[in-house]
Structures are given as structure tokens and as C-alpha cells.
Amino acid sequence: MPQLLPLRLRDVAGRRAAATAAAAATESDPEELEPIGVETQALPVFDSELERTGPLSIIAPRRIGESDLAVYPLSLGASVFGWTADGETSLRILDRFSHHGGNFIDTADSYVGGRSEVLIGKWMRERGNRDGTVVATKVGRHHENPGLGSVSIVRAVEASLERLQTDYIDLLYFHDDDPEVPLEDSLATVEWLIESGKVRYLAASNFSADRLIEARILSSTGLPKFIAVQTQYNLMHRSEFESALRIVASAQGLAVMPYYALANGFLTGKYRSKDDLNADARSIRAAAYVNRRGQRVLAALDRVAAEHESSPASIAIAWLLAKRNVVAPVASASRPEQVDALLAAAGIRLTRAQMLELDRVSE
């Protein structure tokens, strides 16, 4: 490991010791799978149907926190790439997403053992569109580089860069908090990665409000600060975010990136009764919502969707986009034709009455 990193970590340790002394003187997603072999054949020819169409609509980009990253307000979740969406299908999904204006892709080093990143890297190389694509990936869950220790972070980032076939990561998430590692050590490691040009910005996933506050205090010493937070948030799962986490995110100006935006597919209307459920992983997770509350939410989504001549999925994402600090919900597609409903959400403006109705039925 380059010498700059351990030197910086020693500086952090010194700051931590000084802070301790001062205080004493004054008396607070798909599970990881084994990697799958990578095909070597070229990408499928660009869909001729896409060549005859343009973007769905003109949508203003949104900025991610205090950064220069401007993104379409929908992040394409890549956890299904190489899993429920095979390699060729994944590439066609990416083509459709990009052609209709999408530029923000969310992945992780642990998704399908790194296969998701491999497919994204292959697509960017063949299409020559790396500069126009904002790539977010996460570290901390891959079985070869677990946790947020310095060595794990550096090795994980190097491996992601190789799979993505790029020199830099636009937005690096800590996939989960790691209570076994001092947060300042993890931040110092990312500082070195930023100085090296391998990472542009840092974000947090699945962090508590208290830990976000701690991280912001540490950033006052010159360490990198989080510019975004990713958390589970949708019409069926609200309380976790609509608490101290929302208050802290707003106070810190963090861009909020809700994952499971469609509640494992439930908010698309695919699972309306127990008869619609099957044995796949998404269906099993969605089963928790097949109840009276879920039926009320789907009925409201159907009504609002009819008023906008849209779909329940688009309305569910539009509801998120109307919430303060939400920049780009994360949603995935297992077929190319599903992409349109995801992107269409950014062009929908819900009325106050519609927002109140959706808020009420989902309480």
C-alpha cells in the first residue's frame, strides 16, 4: 500500500488521541453470490427501435449534494444484472436507460460477486460513454474485502475499478456502517483515494443519524464528508427514514437516494394477492406487503396513475421525488421495457391532494 495512506492514518490516530485528552480535561439488497464467468462476445447491436426514438421528455438534472455531479432523477439499480437479468438483457436495459436520458447507475462490489460491475464496465467501454455516465458503487460487503478497514477499502476500490474498466468512481458508498473500525480511519482511507483520483465523492448507505452526525464532525478536521445517503424508503417502508435520519439529512444537505423504491416490485401492482406470489426472492420479500394496508396503497396508486395516464410504478417513484432532499430513487428493471416507467416518473408532478392521499393511505 502507498506510504501516504499509513502516514495519514497516523495523523488521524494523533487527532483522535488529542480529542480524547481534551475531553478528559473538560470532562458522545440481493445477497452476495459467487462470481459468474464473463462472456467475451461483443455487445448486442444497438436496438434499432431505440434509434428511431428520442428521450421520453426533457428532464432537468438534479445535483448530488455539494458536488458537481448532475444526474437524471432516477438511478438505475444494477443489483439484478447477471442475476434475474442475464448478461445480454442487462446490456439492453442499460442501452434503453441511456437512450432515454438516464445517466446515473447504482451498483456494488458485492452484487452477484462483482458481475454487475463487470457488465457495466463492458457496456461503458463498448459504448464509449464513460464521461457521460455517473457511476455509484459500494464497498464493504464483498467476501474478499469485507468491512471498512483501510486495506479492505483500498483493495475493494481497486477491484471495482478493474471490473468497471475505469480510472475513477464518481460516488463511492460505504455499503454499511462498520462499528469494528474507527470511522475516522475509514474516512482517511477515502481521503487518500480521492487525492489519488480514484474516487470523486463519498456517500453513506445504511448509516444511522447518529453516525452521520459523527461523520460530519470528523469532516471538520479536513476528512472527506458524505454528500449523500442511501436508505430504504418507499410508500410501504417510511418510518425508518421519516425520523431523525430525515432531519439530519436535511440539516447536512445530503442527497437522499432511496433504495427499494418500488418495495421489491410490490408497488408496480404485480403482487396484488397471495395468488400472485411465487418462490423467487423478490416475490418472497414483497409478500410482507400483501395485506390490507398494501391494498389501500395499490388502490390509491391506481387512482392517481389513471389521473396521470401513467403506471403505479411511475407514481410511486414520483411520490419519492416530491419529498425534500430526495435526488434520485434507486429502482431496477429486469426487462428493457420496464425502464420507461421508471424514467417517466421524473416528468410527473403530483398535486398536493394526490400527495396527501398517498401519505394517508401509506401511514
Annotated model-derived regions:
Residues 4-7, 11-12, 33-35, 49-54, ...:
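Beta/alpha (TIM)-barrel catalytic core signal, keyed to glycine-rich beta->alpha loops juxtaposed to Asp/Glu
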Residues 161-182:
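Active-site groove signature of glycoside hydrolases
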Residues 100, 163-164, 197, 252:
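Structural motif
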